[in-house]
Amino acid sequence: MASDDRPLALTLGDPSGIGPEIALAAWQLRSERGVPPFQLIGDPEFLEATAYRLGLSVPVAEVEPDDACEVFPRALPVLPLPSGAKVIATPGAPDSANAGAIVESITAAVDLVRSGAASAVVTNPIAKFVLTRVGFAHPGHTEFLAALAAREGREPSLPVMMIWSDTLAVVPVTIHVALRRVPELLTQDLVERTARIVHADLRARFGLEHPRLVLSGLNPHAGESGTMGTEDRDVLAPAVAVLRSEGIDIRGPLPADTLFHERARATYDVALTPTHDQALIPVKTLAFDEGVNVTLGLPFVRTSPDHGTAFDIAGKGLAKPDSLIAALRLAHRLAHRPADTVLPFPARA
């Protein structure tokens, strides 16, 4: 199969959330919104029943990996789970009985990309509490994908989560951890490793020859010379100095409260922040329906919509597919970017 003919591999996500219905809606909008070919890995009968329940005119076709692109114009291609597992789910009622199918879908998507049968992984939202009830040991998608990438003797990768939109791109240095643990986890080494991965992937994946990074402070006023906390002075500033000595264009630590207004955003490509919410609050405020989660540092392309399972609206026909469509389109562009082109970045658009 030629590389340009490979479909995207879309995971099932939590079947009690909005993942299945936004996948159906994305297929419906394939022509209008320029959605690239994708195959969903799950249970064809469940997707068919979901379409019927929502009143969506979406034909579903069970496929083999090589058939997806040919089928995509006329039906939503669904690749059954390798185990043949069936999915039974009620919208808005998460059930740990589906945990095995959720995890299997993610693993199968990665395997398709690693085998060359798919061009990139796009993941539908999962609920961590559903999986942890059955012993899932990873804080989230990002960390699990890093573990999958480390199989077969590969060097474990540091999972780096970038939220990308047409308005702003951000990277939290610490991800799915309690806020009280951030000061102990926020080491100079972690900041340096994260920034190096961001710098390398912006060059390799997006084609930015000279990425511009900025690092926000952890404390108010970036610590104000240690009077409001010492992490900015003792951890973040030394990391920036080392990175700059390596030729990486990075500034900081800068006060987080003045980092995201329009003029400031024009001065950098990606903002790194010490905590999860420092990054996600501004990007979700500015681009709630269009944000895309991109995992950096993996040997394959992975994106996902920048929202959760939305159990409260699942099955009600209220979920918007915009973020999933953006994730599908960006994954396709990243996987098929010609070597001599640069993908548009918010501050350079």
Swiss-Prot record:
Family from the record: Belongs to the PdxA family.
Molecular-function GO term, any one: zinc ion binding
GO CC terms of this entry: cytoplasm
GO-annotated biological processes: pyridoxal phosphate biosynthetic process; pyridoxine biosynthetic process
Keywords: Cobalt, Cytoplasm, Magnesium, Metal-binding, NAD, NADP, Oxidoreductase, Pyridoxine biosynthesis, Zinc
Residues engaged in binding a divalent metal cation: H176, H221, H276
Catalytic activity: 4-(phosphooxy)-L-threonine + NAD(+) = 3-amino-2-oxopropyl phosphate + CO2 + NADH
Keyword Cytoplasm recorded: yes
Subunit description: Homodimer.
Annotated protein name in UniProt: 4-hydroxythreonine-4-phosphate dehydrogenase
Pfam assignment, any one: PdxA
Species annotation: Methylorubrum extorquens (strain CM4 / NCIMB 13688) (Methylobacterium extorquens)
Cofactor remark from the record: Binds 1 divalent metal cation per subunit. Can use ions such as Zn(2+), Mg(2+) or Co(2+).
InterPro entries per record: PdxA, PdxA_fam
Listed cofactors: Zn(2+); Mg(2+); Co(2+)
Subcellular location: Cytoplasm
Metabolic or biological pathway: Cofactor biosynthesis; pyridoxine 5'-phosphate biosynthesis; pyridoxine 5'-phosphate from D-erythrose 4-phosphate: step 4/5
